[in-house]
Design a protein with these regions (language model features):
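Conserved binding/catalytic microenvironments
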Residues: 1-167
Length: 167
């Protein structure tokens, strides 16, 4: 029996159940992947969690239908979330994984921060450098996002080397 808290949003409960299913159903595959990798000794627990999360996202938002929805809906995060009955963050995270050769989505990056700029989640397939051991750049618009909740804030960020990213 798998129980989740009644107070959790339905999309969070669904993801938790799919994550747990991944830990059970794909345990041998995960063990093999981790054993064949050259991860540091303290990484297997994190790797299990990451692989189970990927499993959950792939189960709830299968690659091809999700990529088609992204293209058809022009990457409208809220519409895609309604279609797959998932949260805004879950859509954004899944979008960062759409890099299958010959069937790639737009290379995106995802950063989750707190109001102080501490980064708690980072994924970058766009090429943008996201700090691993420090806060976000004070010029990023992530700080303003906390002052305008419920709105999507956009920004063009230029790196010291001249690269430009849509954030």
């Amino acid at each position: 029996e798998f129980l989740t808290a009644e107070a959790l949003p339905p999309e969070t409960s669904l993801f938790a159940a799919a994550h747990h299913l991944g830990l059970l159903a794909a345990a041998l595959d995960m063990e093999r992947l981790i054993a064949e990798s050259e991860l540091p000794a303290d990484a297997p627990v994190l790797a299990h969690n990451a692989l189970a999360s990927y499993f959950a996202a792939a189960l709830i938002m299968p690659y091809e239908p999700f990529l088609k929805a992204c293209r058809d809906m022009r990457y409208d995060i809220e519409r895609i979330g309604r279609r797959f009955r998932v949260s805004f963050e879950q859509v954004c995270h899944r979008m960062t994984t759409l890099q299958r050769p010959g069937q790639a989505g737009i290379p995106l990056h995802l950063v989750r921060t707190d109001i102080a700029g501490n980064i708690s989640k980072r994924f970058s397939l766009s090429g943008i450098h996201i700090p691993r051991h420090s806060g976000a750049c004070p010029r990023w618009n992530v700080y303003g996002a906390f002052l305008q909740q419920g709105q999507i804030n956009v920004q063009i960020s230029q790196m010291p080397e001249g690269q430009r990213y849509f954030c």
